[in-house]
Amino acid sequence: MKRFPGAAALALVMAAFGLAACHGDDDGNNNGSGSQNNALPNFISGGVRTQTYDGTTDDLLTAGLGKDGLASATPPAISNSAAPSAADLRRLAIYSNYRALVDMSANGGYGRFWGPNVDLNGNDTLGEGMIAGKEYLAFADDGSGTLNVSLLVQIPASFNPDQPCIVTATSSGSRGVYGAISAAGEWGLKRGCAVAYTDKGTGNGAHELATNTITLIDGTVLNAVAAGKTSVFTANLGSTNLAAFNAQFPNRYAFKHAHSQQNPEKNWGANTLQAIQFAYWALNDSYGTLNGSTRQIRYKRGDVTTIAASVSNGGGASLAAAEQDTQGWITAVVVGEPQINLSVPSQVSVRQGGLAVASFGRPLADYMTLANLLQPCAALAPAAVGAPYLSTLPLATTASIRAARCASLAVNGVVSGGDVTSQATNALALLHQAGYQTDSDFLQAPMWDSQAVPAVAVTYANAYTQSSVADNLCNFSFGTTNAVTGAAGVSPAVSPMPTVFGNGNGVPPTNGINLVYNAGNSGAADHRFATADASFFGAFCLRGLWTNGDARMTASVNAIRVNANLHGKPAIIVQGRSDTLVPINHASRPYAAMNKLAEGNASNLSFYEVTNGQHFDAFLSVAGFDTRFVPLQYYNLQALNLMWAHLKSGAPLPPSQVVHTVPRGGTAGAAPALSVNNLPAISASPGANAITFGGGGVNVPN
């Protein structure tokens, strides 16, 4: 892998590498003023690495695995498991992240509606789908080495310099820099666009405290002291505090999103804009005219058609970037299931079928801590009977946890009812009152059983309170545990660190690092086993941070709220009505209403609400998901194509609407193959399915 050195050494190697010897302004001088030399943006720290891929032995989209390799249940081999190479880790990261965001089953649509072999028209014409091109990788930082936001630009060999385009692929969740490769990167590469990725300053930065081991930008590991400012993340402890913590809490891990103490979410819009600016620099480095040994600027700000695209909180970051962009970096926005925290004006209202919804516009800190508290109990409500089972635990163990959680909720006055059934029914009713759709009833159990909700609740509570790993917020920590008893503090047979870049998602439990409750009945343990009620008092404490108005959490949440003013940019939001991780009443519905209120007739936002759509397409092959729910990926791709036609040929965007899909049905675990009959197109004339706006309100037809 070729590495461009940082600014301090650039002058010494300018001739060899063809780079300007100085950084430019924050926008990389691509604004039509100042020097015409292609200078690195000032926020780039530590130099730029580049690598070219031939599209045969290795490539941008599949890391040489191709369609079949990505579909294989067997991860790609690592040549040296104790010290994987950067190339092996990149391949593993692309494999893991691609599979994490889409349904990889053939019956579920992989290879037919999406996948490396499927072209932009939805046809199986691309074979294994490998894409040749070049990658640029660098950190964005302020010089302290504590931000170290990973930025990655992929430029496919099919890029047409006379028709330039950029698609952003901001990572979803707390994933690494390849986190949105299947959600947005793939479409951009097939379109011949440069793809601008960022990990948002959260991506998979792990610190193994017992050995003081961290990850570098390419996923390889190093001692934290030796790494210094080149570490993706090093916990802010100091040697004395680190030793004391390790003595009391052995075999624990700090993670960047949870423990950076920086509330990284406040920068996600800016990080997305930085990725775009870095992409401009990379395009100029590739296609700018050479003046001696220096590249000239070919593309200035606004010269490149740029679509901000991603899903989940990557989608939220894209919206935040578009709101913050007053200089013309972003042309349009296409996002799926955006996780966003809203500053809701008093005029805004949300209705479904003409009736006011129970609650809307709550921030994640509110609804996630509530769901984490109530979901195990709500899973026993009669309305949730038959929900998909998404846990590796024996069903009897899960049933016991659920009943015990109901009992603890009742004793502590959170739910009412004299028996488990009535307590569970009340827990589900409380979720409905908090804005969760009845369409989500079958998903309350798997969202908790999969540990998605507990993981997010703990990580974000730490982030919002800007807690140190040493704080053990609400007695939670991250650590390796005994596979049978769940006891924490055990030394792992194999450290998770060498492969955390490739396998991890940045939010424990991940890659063998589990969510631990330190105040268990028999000591620290996996939160599900620490107490009979699955660490109820820890969950109760997390909830109390919000309900009691913890000042740190309140300030952090206020710092990340968005206003929905996209400055007239054409935009599309797609979300599933059944979303139970990011409830639609707290995300897309009120955001769309706020946008129409903020922009009035200047608004160019279309919102498509998909029935039978939920947050995790990767779950759709699981029994009970396959029969009930449809893939949002299909509509995300359709939305990107609609936006492209709008930008390039002036085709009008279809108006906001509900898309009524048809579940596959059949037998759980053996649903019939997905077909176009399940997936009606977004309509140019939605008629009675149109979503309407007025006076700050949105009305979504049933």
What are these model-derived regions, one by one?
Residues G28-N702:
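C-terminal His-loop and adjacent cap/lid subdomain of alpha/beta-hydrolase
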Residues H23-D26:
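Bacterial signal peptide processing site
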Residues M1-A9:
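Bacterial N-terminal signal peptides that target proteins for export
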Residues F17-A21:
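C-terminal motif of bacterial Sec signal peptides marking the signal peptidase cleavage site
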